[in-house]
Amino acid sequence: MMWWSLNLWTVFQILSNIYAGAKRWDNVAAVRKKMKRKRVRKEPGLSWVENQGRVHSFVVGDDAHEDMKLIRGMLEWLNLRSKRAGYTPNHEVILLDVDEDEKSRLLWLHSERIALALPFALLRTPPGSPIRIIKNLRICTDCHVALKLASKLVCREIVMRDINRFHHFRDGICSCNDYW
């Protein structure tokens, strides 16, 4: 049954993404309603980061961490510094019927960005030490761009393992050469 559920989830997700890409929001809502009725759930994006011997996990939009105030402050700082350095958000990866400002905000709530902010926000990692993040799904194109830029802005290597491969972000460049 698990194999069937996984494949059914994949079919529904692809269909929903196709409709969202075409901005057919009524069809997206119908697919999601059908998923709910059939109890087919989307796998949430999760990211893990180790900090001072403790593993922290985050989901998209997570606000449950004890240091979330510091993390949000660091995310805002990274967002502002990134914009000054030329970052422009790729709204196409947000497949929701919301305005552009909301899409920009939602991008900064992806689990890998929250995980990235934790070591900086807590100021507990030695300067120059790498940050290692694990993600259960493929990193989206916008987060890939943001992490490349973040590695340059904060002068740190960021090592991320997503479902496909390792990404080593250093000085604004990724080891995957932007192919993943």
Segments predicted by a language model, with ranges:
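Terminal (and in a subset, N-terminal) low-complexity or junction segments at the ends
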Residues: 1-180
